[in-house]
């Protein structure tokens, strides 16, 4: 089965770092809901500011919060712009729909739903 993008939060800004936390990425519940992530879901993080890419999981936080925890805290700084993406194995790619949430300053600007048919 192909692995396709399921959910993406684009344009998030890191608001904090916690090196001595056990690990993960804290996202505000508002961000989790808008993008369609699940708590404890495995995600890929792409740091637009410095080019770092890493895998972690989501934990819910306060509205607007984007905190790099544990080892991930070494891969970004407060103020860095990041993209967070979740993928899934898809049995029927033709009917797959992904959610793309666009943020500015950690405030939701737009939500798009895209399908493979939108790509052709």
Swiss-Prot record:
Q: Does the keyword Cytoplasm apply?
A: yes
Q: Name one GO molecular function term.
A: aspartate 1-decarboxylase activity
Q: In which pathway does it act?
A: Cofactor biosynthesis; (R)-pantothenate biosynthesis; beta-alanine from L-aspartate: step 1/1
| Location in the cell | Cytoplasm
The cofactor note from the UniProt entry for this protein is: Binds 1 pyruvoyl group covalently per subunit.
User: So what does this thing catalyse?
Assistant: L-aspartate + H(+) = beta-alanine + CO2
InterPro entries (UniProt xref):
Asp_de-COase-like_dom_sf, Asp_decarbox
Which cofactors does the annotated protein need, by name? pyruvate
Keywords attached to this entry:
Autocatalytic cleavage, Cytoplasm, Decarboxylase, Lyase, Pantothenate biosynthesis, Pyruvate, Schiff base, Zymogen
User: Where in the sequence is Pyruvic acid (Ser) found?
Assistant: 24
Record's keyword annotation contains Transcription: no
Modifications after synthesis and translation: Is synthesized initially as an inactive proenzyme, which is activated by self-cleavage at a specific serine bond to produce a beta-subunit with a hydroxyl group at its C-terminus and an alpha-subunit with a pyruvoyl group at its N-terminus.
A Gene Ontology biological process annotation?
alanine biosynthetic process
The record ties this protein, via SUPFAM superfamilies, to: ADC-like
Could you say which residues bind substrate here? Answer: 56, 70-72
Q: Which Gene Ontology cellular component terms are annotated? A: cytosol
Enzyme Commission number(s) of this protein: 4.1.1.11
Catalytic site positions: 24 (schiff-base intermediate with substrate), 57 (proton donor)
UniProt family annotation? Belongs to the PanD family.
Q: How does it assemble?
A: Heterooctamer of four alpha and four beta subunits.
State the function annotated in the UniProt record: Catalyzes the pyruvoyl-dependent decarboxylation of aspartate to produce beta-alanine.
Please report the name of this protein according to its UniProt entry: Aspartate 1-decarboxylase
Instruction: Name the species this protein comes from.
Output: Pyrobaculum islandicum (strain DSM 4184 / JCM 9189 / GEO3)
């Amino acid at each position: 089965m192909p692995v396709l993008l399921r959910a993406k939060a684009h344009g998030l800004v890191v608001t904090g770092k916690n090196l001595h936390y056990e690990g993960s990425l804290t996202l505000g519940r508002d961000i989790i809901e808008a993008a369609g992530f699940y708590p404890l879901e495995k995600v890929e993080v792409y740091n637009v500011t410095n080019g770092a890419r890493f895998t972690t999981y989501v934990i819910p936080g306060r509205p607007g919060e984007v905190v790099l925890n544990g080892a991930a805290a070494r891969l970004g700084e407060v103020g860095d712009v990041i993209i967070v993406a979740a993928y899934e194995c898809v049995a029927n790619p033709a009917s797959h729909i992904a959610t793309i949430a666009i943020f500015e300053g950690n405030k939701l600007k737009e939500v798009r739903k895209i399908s493979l048919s939108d790509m052709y």
